[in-house]
C-alpha cells in the first residue's frame, strides 16, 4: 500500500492500494483479526433488545451500537476520546472496553474456537477437491487413486484410514476402512499382530489374550451381520466399534488409524511437498517418453498425464507461495462484523435476521455441545456424531448451495444464504455492490420529443431539476438571503415555492446532466446534455439523438444523473456532450442522421419540377427570392437564378453571373456553413471534376431556354443526406486543440481582434491546406464575434469606458470560441432538423387508401402459380416426386411469383412520383418495397414456428419453416380467415425471437466485455513488425465480397513500404491510410493485397499501441492513448447482436449448411469456440497439395475417397468423405492445411491443430464479419481482432526447458515470450508451448486478475486457486479498479498525451500565469 499523507497538521493518512493478494488464513491470522471469542449462540436480549455478552452481537467484541458509548457502563464520551478505554466501573477496568464510533461494527471481527479442526468446505468440494488432488491418495498395494467421494466419506466420518502401517503387511498405508470391509481388515491385522507375540513370555501372554478376545468379538459380529440378510442401516454403520479396534492396533503395533478432519490434518501435516513434486515430475517425464514412442497415442496415458499436470500445479502453488497445506483446516472460525449480518427490528417486537446469523448459531450450539461431551468422557460414537455435525454446520456457513442434496433450510423451507451465496451471482457482492452501485442525485421519467431543442440540450422537468440540484439551489437561496437556513431553504424547495424557479434556472447554467437509456448496450447510451427547464413531468429529448439511445417516444423512460465534481463536469462537457458524439464507434459512420419526418421534409424541399410556377425568374439576392416565395409568387420547386456572389464565395471564372437551382435547394443550402460547396444535385462526389459548372451561367444567357434544357434532378433521399452530414463532419469537426486556441486568445486585444486569421493559420502544420485555411477563417470569425460581445458587456458594466481584460474574461472568451468551434456539425444538423420538420408539415403528405396504387397483373401471376401447384400435386400423386421435393418446389415457385408482382409494382411507383406513400418510401423516411408489396400486391409466404433440431441439420432434412400455402391477398384486398390465421405463426415467432435475442445479446455483450475489459491504448508504437496481410474478404462458396479491401485498410497503418505493381514507392512503413489514399490503392493502382499493422500482431502487453490500432472511428482521427478500446470492441460486437436473426433464418428447405451460416447461434459458436458446432462439420485438408482424384470407396459403399498429391514429398494422402456430403473441392484444385474438403463449419481446435494461430484468426474474422454483413450491419475489423486476440492469448506449455513454467500449465502468451527471451539471452533452453484457443466463457476465468475473474463466473473456484497460490492482483485492468473504487486506468485517468481528447484542462488554467491586475478609479480612468 502507498501511504499518502493529506495536509501538514493532520495525523491521519489515506491509503491507496497498489495491489491485492489472496492467501490461506492461518489460525494466527484469524486471532489477529479477532477482537474476542464468541461463545454463546444468543444474539440480543428479547426484553431489553441489548446485545448479549459473548454472543453474536456482543458490543465488547464487535463495537458499540451507539457512538462513543461504553458497552459496559453506558457512559457517553466525546469524539475526541476515540480509541481510549473506559475505566468508569470495576468491570470496565477489568474488561477495558474501547471507546469507538458505531461504524466500527462494520469492520471489527470476532472468532469461534472450534474444539476440533474442521476441513474448509471449498477445498474438498470446489474444482474436484483440491485436497484430493494434492494428496493423491492410494493404498500402498494398489494403483487406483481414491476419488473425491472417498475423501469426503473420510471427512464425514463414514470411513477410517490407515495413516501409518507400523510395519504390518495386512494394513498397507492409506488403506480406507469402511464398515462393510472393516471386519476382514481388522481380523487380518489383529492376527498378524498376535503372531508377532510369544505365548511363552508371560507379559506377552496377556496381550495375546486381549487380541484373541477382540478376534472372537469380531467373528461373532461378522456372523450376526451375515445371518441378518437385511440388516438395518444402523447396524451396518455402527456394528463395529472402529475406535475399540483402532486402540488395540495402535497400542500393540506402530500402526495408526484415523478418521474425519483429524485424519486429513495428519495427512496434510506429514505430506512432503518437494518429494512429491519430484515423483510427479518423473512420472510425467516417463509418460511423455512413452507417448512419443507410440505411433497411436493412447487416450488413457494422455488422461493420466493431464491429472498429473493438475496435481503438479497444486503442489507448485503451495511450494511457491510458501504456505502449509494444513492451513486448509479451520481451528479458529472468523465471525464477520456484526453490521454485515444485521438483526433488524420489525414492528410488534419481532426480528428479521440475516441467514448467516442462523448458520453461526448452529455452529456455536454444536461446538459447545462437543466441548461438553469431550469433558464428560462421552462414548466415542457420540463425539464422532457431534464432530460430523460441526463439519456439516461449518460447510453450510461457507457454501450452503453446494451442500447438495440437502442444504440447510429456514422455517419457510428456503435454503439459507451462506457466505458464498453472498459473493456469487447477479445479486452477489461482486456484481451487485462492487461493480454496480446505486447513484445519488438521479431521477427518471418518460421521454417526449423536443423538436425545438439544440443538439446539446435536454428538457428537464423543473420539479426534477429542483430535487437534482438541491444543494446548489440551497446555497444560492442562502447567498441571496431568500432563506436564512438550510432547513428553510429545503422547505421552499419541497413546497415548490414560485420564488425558487429563477434561482433554479441560474444554478443549472454550465451544469450538464447525463441521460441514460436502459439497456446500455454501447457507450452512446449515456450522453451529456445542457439542461433546459421545462414545465410538465416528462424529459424532452432531441429527436436526432434517439438513434444512439435506440429510443422512441412510445413510453420509453430515461434516467438523469448529475456530475458533481469539477473534473466530472469537464468530462461531461468535453467527452460526453451529445454534440460531440456524431459518429458511431462501431463503423465510424454518423449515428446522428436525420430520419423519418425530417427526411420526408427535405425530400419535398429539394424536389425539382419542370415548368413550376415562377420558373426561370431572376432575383437580385436570396432575400428577394425568399420574399417572392413567401408571398407565393414562385413555387418551392421552381428553378430560379440568383447572382452567384450573393450565395457563396465561389472561386469561378469571372464571366459567371448566375447560379441556377430550385427555391427549395437555396433554402436547404443555407443550413450548411458559408465555405461549404453549394449542393446542386446528388452527384456531389463528382464536383471535383467541375460537374457543377452547368448550374453556373455567364451574363447574357437566355435563362428560360437554358433552364428548360437542364435535366431534372432527383430530390435528396436519406442516404444522400447522410453522406452530406459525413462530409460536413470530415471538413468541419474540430482540428485544433484548445491549448493552441488559448495561445491566440492570450494575444487578442481590442486592436487586433478583428484580424486573427494569420495567428490561427500559423498554428496549423500544413498552412497551405484548404482545410487549414478554412478552419483558421472559422476560428477568426468566432473570435471576432465573441470578443465584441464580451467587450460590449464589460464596457456597459464600466459606464462606457473600455476595461482591461483579466484572465476571467479571457477564459470566458476561450470557452465560447471552443464551444462554437466544436458545435459546427451539430448546428448544421439542427438547421437541417428545423427545415425537415417545417417542410414535412408544409408538404401535406397523407396516407389514405386511395394512395395505395395496385397492379392489374397480380391476378394473372397468382393464377400461374395455382396452375403450377396443381401440376405438382398430380406429379406427387403419381409418385414422380417426393413430399419434400413438392414442398421445396412450391416454396420456390411462390417466391418467384411474389418477385414478379414486386416488379410490376415498381413500375407503378416510377410513374407516380408525386404520391405521398411513394415519396415516403423513396426518400427513405419510412417503409420499403417489401412493405408496399404486402400492402398492394400479395403478402406471400408466411413463416412457421418450427424448431430446427441438431439432428435435422446433421442429416440435412427438409425443415418446413414456411407455410406451404401462401397468403395470396394483400392488406388492401383484406385477408381471408385462413390467411389471417396462417400469418399469426410468423408474427408471434417474430416477437418471441426478439425477446429471446435481446437477453442473449445482453449476455454476449457482458461476456465480451469481460474478455476485453483490460485492453487500453497504452503506447505510441510497440515496434512490432508482425503485420496482417489483408485482401477482400470473400465468401468462397458464392464468390461474393463480404468486406472490400478499401474498407479494411482505411484508417490503418501500413506494416511495410507499399509499392505499386510497377514498382513505384507509394508510401513508407507506418503511414496512415486515409480514405483518399485507400481509394487510390484500390481503384487507381489496382493493388489486391496490403500488409497493415494489426492488433493481432501487437506486442503491447495488456493493451494495444496506437499504430497497431489505427484510427479512432468515433472521432475519425488517430486513436488517443487511454482509449478503452477493449470495451468499445465488446460493445460494438454486442450491441448489434439483437439485430442478428435466430437460427431459424431461412425460407423453408434443407436445414443444412445454408441456414446455419447465419444468425446469432453461429456467432455464439465462434466466440465460445464450440467443440461441436451445429450441423455437419466440415472436413479440412491436413496437407499442401493438389486433389488428384475423387473415387468411390471399395470398403464402404456410402463413402468417397478424396486423394491429395502432397507437395514436395510426392506422396498420396487420402481423406474418406461420406457420399451425402457436399464437396467443396474438385480434381485439380489446390489445397492447403485448413482448406475445406466438404461444406460446413470448421472446428476451431482442429483448424489450430493442422494450421497456425494466424489461419484461425483469419477464419474467425471472416466468419464473424460474414454474420454481421449478411444482416447489413457493418463493424470494423479491428474490434473483431481485439476479441480474437484475447481468445488466442494463452499458451499450453509442452516442454518447460529451463523456464519457471511446468508442463501442462497454461500461461499468457506475453509471459511466455518474455520468459523465453530471458532464457535465450542467458544461453539456456527455452520453453516450448502451443497456442490454444479459449472461448469467451473461459477467457475471463484465465485472467491475470483474480478480482476480474471471480466477479465474472465460478467465483469459488477462482478464489480457491488464488488463495493456495497466494496470487497477487496488480490492478492493471478496469474491472478490478472499479471493484476497489479506484479511477479506472483509461481515459482521463490514463497517461494521455498533451492536447489529446482526454487532456480536458479547465480554460481558466491557460491564463493562471497572467499577472493579476488591481483596478483603481483615478480621475475617471482605469489604471492597473
Curated annotation (Swiss-Prot):
GO BP annotation list: DNA-templated transcription
* Cofactor section: Mg(2+); Zn(2+)
What organism does the record attribute this protein to? Mycoplasma mobile (strain ATCC 43663 / 163K / NCTC 11711)
Q: What is this protein called?
A: DNA-directed RNA polymerase subunit beta'
Positions contributing to Mg(2+) binding: 552, 554, 556
Q: Which NCBIfam families match?
A: rpoC_TIGR
Q: Which SUPFAM superfamilies match?
A: beta and beta-prime subunits of DNA dependent RNA-polymerase
What's the EC number here?
A: 2.7.7.6
Gene name, Swiss-Prot/TrEMBL: rpoC
Q: Where does Zn(2+) bind?
A: 1022, 1098, 1105, 1108
What this protein is reported to do is described as:
DNA-dependent RNA polymerase catalyzes the transcription of DNA into RNA using the four ribonucleoside triphosphates as substrates.
> How is its cofactor bound, per UniProt?
Binds 1 Mg(2+) ion per subunit. Binds 1 Zn(2+) ion per subunit; 2 are expected compared to other organisms.
An example molecular function term from Gene Ontology annotations: DNA binding
Amino acid at each position: 500500500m502507498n501511504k499518502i499523507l493529506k495536509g501538514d497538521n493532520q495525523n491521519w493518512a489515506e491509503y491507496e492500494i497498489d495491489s491485492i493478494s489472496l492467501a490461506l488464513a492461518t489460525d494466527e491470522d484469524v486471532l489477529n483479526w479477532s477482537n474476542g471469542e464468541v461463545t454463546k449462540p444468543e444474539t440480543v436480549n428479547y426484553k431489553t433488545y441489548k446485545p448479549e455478552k459473548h454472543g453474536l452481537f456482543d458490543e465488547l467484541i464487535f463495537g458499540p451500537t451507539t457512538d462513543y458509548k461504553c458497552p459496559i457502563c453506558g457512559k457517553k464520551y466525546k469524539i475526541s476520546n476515540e480509541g481510549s478505554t473506559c475505566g468508569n466501573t470495576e468491570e470496565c477496568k477489568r474488561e477495558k472496553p474501547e471507546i469507538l464510533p458505531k461504524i466500527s461494527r462494520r469492520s471489527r471481527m470476532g472468532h469461534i474456537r472450534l474444539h476440533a479442526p474442521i476441513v474448509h468446505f471449498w477445498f474438498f468440494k470446489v474444482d474436484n477437491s483440491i485436497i484430493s488432488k494434492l494428496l493423491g491418495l492410494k493404498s500402498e498395494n494398489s494403483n487406483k487413486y481414491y476419488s473425491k467421494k472417498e475423501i469426503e466419506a473420510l471427512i464425514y466420518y463414514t470411513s477410517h484410514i490407515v495413516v501409518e502401517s507400523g510395519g504390518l503387511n495386512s494394513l498397507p498405508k492409506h488403506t480406507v476402512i469402511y464398515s462393510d470391509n472393516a471386519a476382514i481388515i481388522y481380523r487380518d491385522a489383529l492376527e498378524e499382530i498376535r503372531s508377532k507375540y510369544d505365548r511363552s513370555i508371560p507379559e506377552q501372554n496377556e496381550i495375546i489374550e486381549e487380541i484373541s478376545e477382540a478376534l472372537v468379538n469380531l467373528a461373532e459380529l461378522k456372523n450376526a451381520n451375515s445371518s441378518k440378510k437385511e440388516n438395518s442401516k444402523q447396524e451396518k454403520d455402527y456394528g463395529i466399534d472402529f475406535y475399540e479396534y483402532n486402540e488395540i492396533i495402535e497400542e500393540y503395533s506402530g500402526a495408526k488409524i484415523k478418521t474425519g478432519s483429524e485424519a486429513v490434518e495428519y495427512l496434510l501435516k506429514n505430506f512432503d511437498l518437494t518429494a512429491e513434486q519430484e515423483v510427479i515430475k518423473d512420472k510425467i517425464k516417463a509418460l511423455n517418453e512413452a507417448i512419443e514412442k507410440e505411433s497411436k497415442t493412447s487416450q488413457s496415458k494422455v488422461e493420466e498425464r493431464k491429472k498429473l499436470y493438475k496435481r503438479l500445479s497444486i503442489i507448485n502453488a503451495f511450494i511457491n507461495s510458501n504456505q502449509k497445506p494444513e492451513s486448509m483446516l479451520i481451528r479458529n472460525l472468523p465471525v464477520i462484523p456484526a453490521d454485515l449480518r444485521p438483526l433488524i427490528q420489525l414492528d410488534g417486537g419481532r426480528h428479521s435476521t440475516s441467514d448467516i446469523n442462523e448458520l453461526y448459531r448452529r455452529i456455536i450450539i454444536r461446538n459447545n455441545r462437543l466441548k461438553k461431551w469431550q469433558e464428560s468422557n462421552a462414548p466415542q460414537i457420540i463425539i464422532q456424531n457431534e464432530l460430523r455435525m460441526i463439519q456439516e454446520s461449518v460447510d453450510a456457513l461457507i457454501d450452503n448451495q453446494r451442500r447438495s442434496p440437502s442444504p440447510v433450510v429456514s422455517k419457510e423451507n428456503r435454503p439459507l444464504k451462506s457466505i458464498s451465496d453472498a459473493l456469487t451471482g447477479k445479486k452477489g457482492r461482486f456484481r451487485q455492490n462492487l461493480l454496480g452501485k446505486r447513484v445519488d442525485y438521479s431521477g427518471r421519467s418518460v421521454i417526449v420529443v423536443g423538436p425545438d431543442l439544440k443538439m446539446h440540450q435536454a428538457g428537464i422537468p423543473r420539479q426534477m431539476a429542483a430535487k437534482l440540484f438541491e444543494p446548489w439551489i440551497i446555497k444560492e437561496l442562502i447567498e441571496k438571503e431568500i432563506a436564512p437556513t438550510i432547513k428553510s431553504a429545503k422547505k421552499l424547495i419541497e413546497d415548490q415555492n414560485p420564488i425558487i424557479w429563477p434561482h433554479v434556472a441560474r444554478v443549472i447554467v454550465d451544469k450538464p446532466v447525463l441521460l441514460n437509456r436502459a439497456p446500455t448496450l454501447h457507450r452512446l447510451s449515456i450522453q451529456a446534455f445542457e439542461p433546459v427547464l421545462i414545465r410538465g413531468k416528462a424529459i424532452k429529448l432531441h429527436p436526432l439523438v434517439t438513434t444512439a439511445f435506440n429510443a422512441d417516444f412510445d413510453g420509453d423512460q430515461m434516467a438523469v444523473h448529475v456530475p458533481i465534481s469539477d473534473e466530472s463536469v469537464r468530462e461531461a462537457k468535453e467527452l460526453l456532450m451529445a454534440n460531440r458524439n456524431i459518429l458511431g464507434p462501431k463503423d465510424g459512420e454518423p449515428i446522428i442522421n436525420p430520419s423519418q419526418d425530417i427526411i420526408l421534409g427535405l425530400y419535398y424541399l429539394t424536389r425539382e419540377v419542370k415548368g413550376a410556377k415562377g420558373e426561370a425568374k431572376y432575383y437580385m439576392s436570396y432575400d428577394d427570392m425568399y420574399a417572392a416565395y413567401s408571398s407565393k409568387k414562385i413555387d418551392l420547386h421552381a428553378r430560379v437564378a440568383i447572382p452567384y456572389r450573393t450565395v457563396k464565395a465561389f472561386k469561378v471564372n469571372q464571366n459567371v453571373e448566375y447560379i441556377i437551382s430550385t427555391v427549395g435547394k437555396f433554402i436547404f443550402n443555407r443550413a450548411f456553413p458559408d465555405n461549404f460547396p453549394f449542393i446542386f444535385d446528388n452527384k456531389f462526389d463528382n464536383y471535383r471534376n467541375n460537374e457543377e459548372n452547368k448550374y453556373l451561367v455567364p451574363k447574357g444567357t437566355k435563362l428560360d431556354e437554358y433552364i428548360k434544357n437542364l435535366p431534372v434532378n432527383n430530390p435528396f433521399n436519406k442516404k444522400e443526406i447522410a453522406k452530406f452530414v459525413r462530409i460536413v463532419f470530415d471538413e468541419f469537426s474540430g482540428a485544433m486543440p484548445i491549448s493552441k486556441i488559448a495561445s491566440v486568445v492570450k494575444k487578442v486585444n481590442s486592436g487586433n481582434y478583428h484580424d486573427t486569421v494569420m495567428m490561427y493559420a500559423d498554428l496549423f502544420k500544413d498552412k497551405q491546406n484548404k482545410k487549414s485555411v478554412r478552419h483558421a477563417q472559422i476560428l477568426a470569425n468566432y473570435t471576432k464575434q465573441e470578443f465584441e460581445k464580451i467587450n460590449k458587456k464589460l464596457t456597459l458594466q464600466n459606464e462606457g469606458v473600455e476595461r482591461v481584460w483579466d484572465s476571467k474574461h479571457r477564459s470566458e472568451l476561450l470557452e465560447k470560441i471552443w464551444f462554437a468551434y466544436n458545435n459546427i456539425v451539430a448546428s448544421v444538423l439542427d438547421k437541417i432538423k428545423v427545415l425537415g420538420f417545417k417542410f414535412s408539415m408544409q408538404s401535406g403528405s397523407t396516407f389514405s387508401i386511395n394512395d395505395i396504387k395496385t397492379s392489374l397483373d397480380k391476378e394473372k401471376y397468382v393464377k400461374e402459380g395455382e396452375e403450377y401447384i396443381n401440376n405438382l400435386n398430380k406429379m406427387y400423386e403419381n409418385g414422380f416426386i417426393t413430399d419434400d421435393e413438392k414442398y421445396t418446389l412450391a416454396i420456390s415457385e411462390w417466391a418467384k411469383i411474389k418477385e414478379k408482382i414486386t416488379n410490376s409494382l415498381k413500375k407503378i411507383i416510377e410513374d407516380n412520383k408525386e404520391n405521398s406513400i411513394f415519396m415516403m418510401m423513396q426518400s427513405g423516411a419510412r417503409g420499403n418495397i417489401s412493405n408496399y408489396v404486402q400492402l398492394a400486391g400479395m403478402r406471400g409466404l408466411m413463416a412457421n414456428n418450427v424448431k430446427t433440431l441438431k439432428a435435422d441439420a446433421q442429416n440435412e432434412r427438409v425443415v418446413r419453416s414456411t407455410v406451404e400455402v401462401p397468403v395470396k391477398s394483400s392488406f388492401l384486398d383484406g385477408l381471408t380467415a385462413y390467411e389471417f390465421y396462417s400469418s399469426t405463426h410468423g408474427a408471434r415467432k417474430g416477437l418471441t425471437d426478439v425477446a429471446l435475442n435481446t437477453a442473449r445479446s445482453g449476455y454476449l455483450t457482458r461476456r465480451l466485455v469481460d474478455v476485453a475489459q483490460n485492453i487500453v491504448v497504452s503506447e505510441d508504437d510497440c515496434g512490432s513488425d508482425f503485420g496482417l496481410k489483408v485482401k477482400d474478404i470473400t465468401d468462397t462458396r458464392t464468390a461474393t465480397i463480404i468486406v472490400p479491401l478499401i474498407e479494411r485498410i482505411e484508417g490503418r497503418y501500413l506494416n511495410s513500404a507499399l509499392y505499386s505493381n510497377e514498382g513505384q514507392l507509394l508510401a513508407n512503413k507506418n503511414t496512415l491510410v486515409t480514405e483518399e489514399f485507400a481509394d487510390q490503392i484500390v481503384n487507381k493502382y489496382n493493388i489486391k493485397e496490403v500488409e497493415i499493422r494489426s492488433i493481432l500482431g501487437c506486442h503491447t502487453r495488456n493493451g494495444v499501441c496506437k499504430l497497431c490500432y489505427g484510427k479512432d472511428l468515433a472521432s475519425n482521427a488517430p486513436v488517443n492513448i487511454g482509449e478503452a478500446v477493449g470495451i468499445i470492441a465488446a460493445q460494438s460486437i454486442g450491441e448489434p447482436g439483437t439485430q442478428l436473426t435466430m437460427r431459424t433464418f431461412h425460407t423453408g428447405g434443407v436445414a443444412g449448411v445454408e441456414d446455419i451460416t447465419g444468425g446469432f447461434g453461429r456467432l455464439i459458436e465462434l466466440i465460445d469456440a464450440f467443440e461441436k458446432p451445429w450441423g455437419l462439420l466440415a472436413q479440412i485438408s491436413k496437407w499442401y497439395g493438389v486433389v488428384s482424384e475423387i473415387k468411390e470407396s471399395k470398403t464402404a459403399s456410402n463413402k468417397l475417397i478424396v486423394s491429395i498429391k502432397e507437395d514436395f514429398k510426392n506422396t498420396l494422402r487420402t481423406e474418406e468423405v461420406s457420399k451425402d456430403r457436399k464437396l467443396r473441392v474438385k480434381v485439380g484444385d489446390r489445397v492447403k492445411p485448413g482448406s475445406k474438403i466438404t461444406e460446413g463449419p470448421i472446428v476451431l481446435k482442429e483448424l489450430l491443430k493442422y494450421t497456425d494461430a494466424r489461419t484461425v484468426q483469419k477464419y474467425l474474422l471472416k466468419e464473424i464479419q460474414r454474420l454481421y454483413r449478411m444482416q447489413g450491419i457493418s463493424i470494423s475489423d479491428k474490434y473483431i481482432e481485439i476479441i480474437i486476440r484475447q481468445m488466442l492469448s494463452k499458451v499450453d506449455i509442452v516442454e518447460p526447458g529451463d523456464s519457471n513454467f511446468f508442463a501442462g500449465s497454461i500461461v499468457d502468451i506475453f509471459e511466455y515470450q518474455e520468459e523465453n527471451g530471458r532464457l535465450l539471452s542467458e544461453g539456456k533452453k527455452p520453453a516450448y508451448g502451443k497456442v490454444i484457443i479459449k472461448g469467451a466463457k473461459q477467457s475471463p476465468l484465465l485472467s491475470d486478475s483474480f478480482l476480474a475473474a471471480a466477479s465474472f463466473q465460478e467465483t469459488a473456484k477462482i478464489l480457491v486457486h488464488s488463495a493456495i497460490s497466494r496470487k497477487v492482483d496488480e490492478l492493471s485492468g478496469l474491472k478490478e479498479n472499479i471493484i476497489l473504487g479506484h479511477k479506472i486506468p483509461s481515459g482521463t485517468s490514463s497517461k494521455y498525451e498533451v492536447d489529446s481528447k482526454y487532456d480536458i484542462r479547465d480554460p481558466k488554467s491557460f491564463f493562471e500565469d497572467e499577472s493579476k491586475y488591481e483596478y483603481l478609479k483615478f480621475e475617471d480612468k482605469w489604471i492597473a
